[in-house]
């Protein structure tokens, strides 16, 4: 059976409504990262977008991959906590602008519940990160 990778897009709705004037942006980071996976045909790849899907309908995944901006922290942590409780054997990875800025602000401890934090261009290392997590390295 193919391993399942679930990309999680969970923007803070208040920030999106007030700062983005209600404009909902497609999570292009998911397509960018998944297109950089080696042997992507060996995975079941899904996208969860909290603006569309209900968290209670999410199914188990081998790896949940998150990204976001600083303002999404509350939503990201809420979704991650819910999924970790339901799927304790899954791996949880986070990257994107939130990790870079938290690293610069010495605030990475706010993401301590994740199994792996990626800082920098995930496109270059996504395949290695996925394989290492699937092989418990």
Residues covered by each model-derived region:
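Extreme N-terminal starter segment of soluble prokaryotic enzymes
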Residues: 1-5
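Short polar catalytic/cofactor-binding loops
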Residues: 7-14
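Glycine- and acidic-residue-enriched helix-capping/strand-helix junction motifs
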Residues: 14-30
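Glycine-rich beta-alpha loop elements in corrinoid/cobalamin-binding modules
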Residues: 34-137
């Amino acid at each position: 059976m193919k391993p399942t990778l679930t990309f999680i897009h969970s923007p803070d709705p208040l920030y999106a409504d007030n700062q983005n004037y209600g404009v909902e942006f497609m999570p292009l980071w998911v397509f960018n990262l998944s297109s950089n996976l080696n042997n992507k045909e060996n995975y079941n790849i899904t996208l969860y977008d909290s603006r569309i899907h209900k968290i209670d309908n999410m199914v188990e995944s081998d790896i949940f991959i998150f990204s976001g901006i600083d303002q999404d922290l509350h939503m990201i942590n809420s979704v991650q906590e819910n999924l970790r409780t339901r799927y304790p054997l899954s791996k949880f990875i986070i990257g994107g602008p939130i990790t870079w800025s938290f690293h610069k602000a010495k605030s990475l401890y706010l993401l301590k519940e994740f199994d792996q934090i990626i800082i920098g261009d995930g496109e270059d290392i996504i395949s290695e990160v996925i394989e290492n997590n699937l092989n418990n390295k």
